[in-house]
């Protein structure tokens, strides 16, 4: 019986190791990447553990990449400081397949890619591109705080839609937004000849008071 239990434990442990293997499929741990930034400082993907990270393969010479960059910038600006169920904050680890440093830096500046940018300037001969099975760009991988791949190749609005699914909703912020809308509606009605001091105003006033009380309780 004891040997049987030990075998079960070993099987479970082996299954855990298998499920957490390093690879490029959803559910795998993304392989580490260590490449220099434009200043020559080496940056490791694993140093960003704890955050939600988009591993983004692109190049300044890639037309589709440049067209996609505004969507990526918008997602970064919107979600950079958010808290997620799968990590704290959102950042981007941009890997360029450029071979000319000047063009790479120019692309970063023009497209306002204000996040981690790295490259070995090896074009399609980059070992990192090979490691991640990248055959075309743009190409990306979304990883959680533990480096596990949760999504791949998120283009256009799909990137924001995917990030939104993982956002931790702040109840206080939600109530405050609702309160702001109700107060605006109340002020508009209060100055309206059509409504004056109607039942609608009293109803709104009660709703405002209830929300203010809810916010106060949440902040305790």
Located regions from the model:
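Short active-site neighborhood of thiol/selenol oxidoreductases, capturing the structured segment around
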Residues: 44-66, 72
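Bacterial Sec-dependent N-terminal signal peptides
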Residues: 1-24
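Thiol-/selenol-based redox modules, centered on thioredoxin-like
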Residues: 137, 142-220
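N-terminal "domain-start" segment that seeds a small globular fold
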Residues: 18-46, 168-169
